UniProtKB/Swiss-Prot annotation:
Gene for this chain: rhaM
SUPFAM superfamilies from the UniProt entry: Dimeric alpha+beta barrel
Protein name, per record: L-rhamnose mutarotase
The family this protein is said to belong to: Belongs to the rhamnose mutarotase family.
Catalyzed reactions: alpha-L-rhamnose = beta-L-rhamnose
Length: 104
């Protein structure tokens, strides 16, 4: 498995709405993530800085990247763009993090 971590932001006035929309996520989105090899996907909120920290284990970069081109992912991004900064294609503004330590 490949471990990934990344950060995103959520609008200061949208913490509760962001959490509500993820509780639960759309079943179709969950199915696409799983079918594309995503496991142990978690998102954490830093309330004071409006930061979202996400971790996920993936089976391959190619399969993970393919999620973005699915219709359900495109609809999810559009659904979420009003609660977080988004790129012109509606994907969330994010930055990948470099792993510096792992204790198995």
């Amino acid at each position: 498995m490949i471990r990934k971590a990344f950060v995103m932001q959520v609008n200061a006035d949208a913490h509760e709405e962001y959490q509500r929309r993820h509780n639960p996520i759309w079943p179709e989105l969950e199915a696409v993530l799983k079918s594309h090899g995503a496991h142990h996907y978690a998102i954490y909120l830093d309330v004071e800085r409006n930061l979202l920290f996400a971790t996920v284990e993936i089976e391959s970069e190619a399969r993970w990247n393919a999620v973005a081109s699915t219709d359900i992912c495109q609809r999810w991004w559009k659904h979420m763009r009003d609660v977080m900064p988004a790129n012109p294609d509606n994907s969330p503004v994010s930055a990948e993090l470099k792993e510096v330590f792992w204790l198995a």
